[in-house]
Amino acid sequence: MTKKRHLFTSESVTEGHPDKICDQISDSILDAILSKDANARVACETTVTTGLVLVAGEITTSTYVDIPKIVRETIQGIGYTRAKYGFDAETCAVLTSIDEQSADIAMGVDQALEAREGQMTDAEIEAIGAGDQGLMFGFACNETQELMPLPISLAHKLARRLTEVRKDDTLSYLRPDGKTQVTVEYDENGKPVRVDTIVISTQHHPDVTWEEIDRDLKEHVIKAVVPAELMDGETKFFINPTGRFVIGGPQGDAGLTGRKIIVDTYGGYARHGGGAFSGKDATKVDRSAAYAARYVAKNIVAAGLADKAEVQLAYAIGVAQPVSISVDTFGTGKVSEDVLVELVRNNFDLRPAGIIKMLDLRRPIYKQTAAYGHFGRTDVDLSWERTDKAAALKEQAGL
C-alpha cells in the first residue's frame, strides 16, 4: 500500500509553565539530596497554584536539605520574581509533607545496594530488584542530528528560545509562561520535508500589543530557530491566537509534577509507558529504564542498524532482569528485530543496578533535564545520549 504525505505535530512548554515549575522543583530537591547522599531514595511530587507550593512524597536519606529554600530559589531562577506576575518566589507559601519510603517497596530494592554499583559482583547486581513493575519505551530516528523526531526537536528549540529572549531582555515584555507547537509535513517515504504550522503562546506584559508580539516572535524566535528551507509561503503561524495572555503561570493554571510526560520524551511520535521522570531517583525504573531504553535505541540508529528504533523494557517489582525486551524498527531495520534484541541483551546491562552503573545515575544531574526535554539534548552532557556502543553493535551485526 502506498504511503501518503501526512502531518505530525508535537508541543513543548517553557520552564515557566505551571507543570514544568513543578518538575524543576522536584528535580532541584532530588539534586540537592543526591549531592550530599548519593544513595538517597527520593520520590518527590510538587503542586503549585496561586501563591502556594506543596511538596509531598517519600524521601529516605541520611542528609538534610532546606526544601523551602530550594523551592524559592528554583522559582526565582525561572523568573517569577514579582507579585504582578501572579506568582512570587519570595512571598508564595511553601508547604511540605514528606514521609520515608515504604518498607515493603524498599525490601525489593535494598539488598546490597549501598553506594557500591562500581564494585558490585554480577551476583550482587542480580540481587537488586526493580523498585516497581512497569513498562518503558526509548526511541531514536535519523530525522535530526540528535537522532530525535523533528517536530519535538523544533518545539523544544522554540520554547528554549522564548526563555532566552525573555531572560536576556531582547523581549523584556515577555513573562515566564509559554507553549510552542510545531506541525511537520512528511513525504511518501516518511521523511520530513517542511514545517506546516507553528503555534506559540507566551505570557506577556499587559501593555504590549499583539502586533508587537507577532512581529517580534517571528523575527527573534522563529527565524532564529527554524531553518528557512523548512518554511515556505504556505507555512502557517499562530502567535498568541487568543490575542492576550497576561494571566499565566500558577495563577492561570495549577501545576503538577509529571504532567508533561510527552513533552519530556518524544512529542507523541513514539509510545510511552506512562511513568513520569522528575523527582525520582535512579532506583525508580520509570526514570532509569526509560533513559536506558533511549540509550539503546540511539545506539542502534547511530550504528546504522535502523533508520528508527523503538525499544520497550518491562520490569516486575523486586526482580532484576527485565521481564521483556522488545525492539521495533518500523520496517527500517538492516537486520532482523530478533538479532537486534540479542545484540541489546549482549551489550547493555538492563538490570536496575546495571543501568545505574552503566549510565552513572547517582549524580545531581536531573534539574537540567526538567525543562526542554530529557532526550536529544545538545546543550548538556547526558550519559544516555552518548553513542559509545554504536561501533560494537555495528561490528557484531556484521555490517
Curated annotation (Swiss-Prot):
Quick one: which residues bind ATP? H17, D177, G178, K179, R244, F245, D253, R259, K260, A276, K280
Top enzyme class: transferase
Binding of Mg(2+) occurs at D19
Q: Which InterPro entries match?
A: ADOMET_SYNTHASE_CS, S-AdoMet_synt_C, S-AdoMet_synt_central, S-AdoMet_synt_N, S-AdoMet_synthetase, S-AdoMet_synthetase_sfam
Ordered alphabetically, the record's keywords are: ATP-binding, Cytoplasm, Magnesium, Metal-binding, Nucleotide-binding, One-carbon metabolism, Potassium, Transferase
Q: What is its EC number?
A: 2.5.1.6
Instruction: List, alphabetically, the NCBIfam families matched.
Output: metK (TIGR01034)
Return the protein name: S-adenosylmethionine synthase
Q: Which organism is it from?
A: Bacillus cereus (strain G9842)
